[in-house]
Amino acid sequence: KRQGKSMILAIDIGNTNIVIGCIDGEKVCFVERASTNLAKTELEYVVEFRTLFELYHIGMEDITGSIISSVVPPLNNIIKSGLEKMFHQAPMVVGPGVKTGLNILMDNPAQLGSDLVVNAVAGLHYYGAPIIMIDMGTATTISVVDEKKNYIGGMILPGAKVSLDSLVNRTSQLPRISLEPP
């Protein structure tokens, strides 16, 4: 068993992977990745999550809450329902109306992706303001937060693999290379 009964399950639903983490206070108990799969059912995701708890010897009763950040809306309710069945309480879903301490200075703050919000909040927590956060996933995102904790802008760019695939497929002489270190 782990420390106490204050663990939070954090789930980041991305386009390519779902990252699942368990946090006990300031201690990260585990971080694992599963493939994002729109064909999976609620039950299949619940089985994956429960398997992780067994693997890391964490009791269901030790989890006091869960939070979801998602850029894949079709999976939101599937995973949310699964977590409700597992923990008998609704997870927090990062989105409009969730208080983060971040002032989003955009014409329509509700359009800012939850991935960008959680990256900015994590950056502020660990490094303070001002900060520029770069997240290199399926898309590369850049978030800028000023010294007053205002989210003042960002960019969404093709990720490294998406860019590489595009260049290889749309150019005549560029060979496919590995993104892995030699």
List the predicted regions and their residue ranges.
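Glycine-rich phosphate-binding loops at beta-strand->alpha-helix junctions
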Residues: 38, 69-76
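Short glycine-rich phosphate-binding loop at a beta-alpha junction
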Residues: 61-71, 90-92
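A mobile "lid/hinge" subdomain adjacent to the ATP/sugar-phosphate binding pocket shared
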Residues: 170-182
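Phosphate-binding/catalytic loop of phosphoryl-transfer enzymes
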Residues: 81, 86-92, 98-171
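Short glycine-rich, Thr/Ser-proximal phosphate-binding strand/loop in the N-terminal lobe
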Residues: 8-51, 148-166, 170-171
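Short glycine-aspartate micro-motif
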Residues: 8-12, 67, 131-135
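Phosphate/pyrophosphate-binding loops at sites that engage ATP/ADP/AMP, CoA/4′-phosphopantetheine
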Residues: 49-65
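Short, Lys/Arg-enriched N-terminal segments with co-localized hydrophobic residues
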Residues: 1-6
